[in-house]
Structures are given as C-alpha cells and as structure tokens.
Amino acid sequence: MRNQMKIALLVGLAIVCIGLFLFYDLGNWDYTLPRRIKKVAAIVLTGGAIAFSTMIFQTITNNRILTPSILGLDSLYMLIQTGIIFLFGSANMVIMNKNINFIISVLLMILFSLVLYQIMFKGEGRNIFFLLLIGIVFGTLFSSLSSFMQMLIDPNEFQVVQDKMFASFNNINTDLLWLAFIIFLLTGVYVWRFTKFFDVLSLGREHAVNLGIDYDKVVKQMLIVVAILVSVSTALVGPIMFLGLLVVNLAREFLKTYKHSYLIAGSVFISIIALVGGQFVVEKVFTFSTTLSVIINFAGGIYFIYLLLKENKSW
C-alpha cells in the first residue's frame, strides 16, 4: 500500500472516530452537540500538538525512544502552576486568568528551552545528549521544588494545583481553545517549510552539516517550537508522558518511510484516532470507571519497554 493510501486510511479512521464521538447516543442535540464539538476540538488539538512535537524532538535528537518530557518541560509547567498558587494564591484573578496563565507558561517554557540551548552549545564537544542530561537534572529539580511548595500551601489551594497535575480529557480547558488553535496553526505553518530539513537532520549532525544544513540554527528554532507545542497540549489537558512516544513509533512502523511529510501527518492522525477513539471507549464502554490517560500511560509504558528490548537486540 502506498503511503498516500495509508494516510487516507488514517484520515478516514479519524473521521469515523470523531463522528462516533459526536453523534453516538446524542440525546438533546442543542445541549450535547456544542459541548462535544468543543471537547473533540480540544482533543484533536492536543493529539496533534503532542505528536507533532514528539516527531520533531526525535528527529533533532536522532533517537526514537525520547520524548520532550525528558527536557523537563512537563515538570517546569507544574512548577509554574504551583509557584503561581504559592506566591499569589488562587484568588488572584489576574494571574489565575486562564489566557494570562497560558501565555506566562508558554513564555517561561520557551525561555527555559533557550537557556538549555545556550548551555548545550556554550563549550566545545557539547552535543544533544548533554542537553538531555541537563534536562533530566532540571526536570528532577523542578519536580522537587513543586513537591516542596505543595507541602507548604493551603490544602484548599493544593486542590487547585492537583487539578493541573494529572491529564484529564473530561475537564478540558476549552476557554483556551481559540488561542491554542491559533498558536498551533501558526506553528504548523512555520514548521512545514522545515520538513525537507528534517529528512536530513534525521541522519545526524555530521551528515546534516556536510549537506549544507545550518544545524545549530535549525535545532534552536525547533526546540522553541517543541516548547510551544508542549505548553499548548499541557495547558489544555495536563501532562501526558507516553502518548507521543506511542503514536510516533506506530507511525514509523505503519508508514515505513523516512519522509517527514508523511511521518508527521501519520503520527498526528494516529494520535487523533487514539485520543478520540480512546475517550469514546472510556465513556461508553468503561462508563468512566477509568481514565484515558491511565490507559495511554499503561500502553505507552509497555511499548517503551518493547522498544528498549528491540533496540538492545539490534545492538
């Protein structure tokens, strides 16, 4: 099957999943349909942002088992949210305004990515693996600081923080939908012209430089893009650890191509199918007895172990 046909198949499955979610057991159209449309839009945006950012990140790191969470961006997001509550309280209407909070989170995550990038290329012989090591250290630091502040704040305000700690597709922040959509659209348009570079970047730094790619500049720009996309997805539903790893590697296995124009589209549609279809199953089959994030992390964790064992055998 050609890759165009495979992408068309994924698009068809995504449309079927969205149609089922929107129209199955609808009941009162006027009340239910607008809410389901908002929910589906947020899920699609989240799935697209996670898949897009993970594919870009794996390309610039040239590693199939890494996700942007290794940079500590998820931990930084939680530190920002905890710090805001700790310093200003949950009653501060300006800081707790969802749009202002979202913009602050995005800007701080971009700033952190730039600082990491400067550390990465400050000395000779530093490479992407040094960046990942620093990211792990900072991620641990941010998690520890968040836990420390959570121990000190008022229990009622801790409840506000706790709502942001876990991914929830039943309590999606739809107020940010238009802002997130505009950011995602602009980011996608900006990144699309780099897709021809991604095919070369996936060969590694030395090959990319030899073939005329301004490696440092492109990596710096893509790290900013990853920070933006991660902040969009995290602000909408909360942190999800393994979704990107799962859908990107499934896209690679399904499409079996090096062309990122196909891989990005495939991973985005697989992510949409997984999230919308998974949420439909959680609501209609499991009747909310479990959550989609638990299923994703469980399946993603098993697949991560499989990838490690598979790569170990290839070594």
Swiss-Prot record:
Keywords: Cell membrane, Ion transport, Iron, Iron transport, Membrane, Transmembrane, Transmembrane helix, Transport. One of its GO terms (cellular component) is plasma membrane. It is a multi-pass membrane protein. InterPro entries: ABC_BtuC-like, ABC_transptr_permease_BtuC. Pfam families: FecCD. CDD domains: TM_ABC_iron-siderophores_like (cd06550). It is found in: Cell membrane. Gene3D superfamilies: ABC transporter involved in vitamin B12 uptake, BtuC. One of its GO terms (biological process) is siderophore-dependent iron import into cell. One of its GO terms (molecular function) is transmembrane transporter activity. The chain crosses the membrane at residues 7-27, 40-60, 76-96, 100-120, 128-148, 172-192, 223-243, 262-282, 288-308. Belongs to the binding-protein-dependent transport system permease family. FecCD subfamily. The complex is composed of two ATP-binding proteins (YclP), two transmembrane proteins (YclN and YclO) and a solute-binding protein (YclQ). Part of the ABC transporter complex YclNOPQ involved in uptake of ferric-petrobactin. Petrobactin is a photoreactive 3,4-catecholate siderophore produced by many members of the B.cereus group, including B.anthracis. Probably responsible for the translocation of the substrate across the membrane. This is Petrobactin import system permease protein YclO.
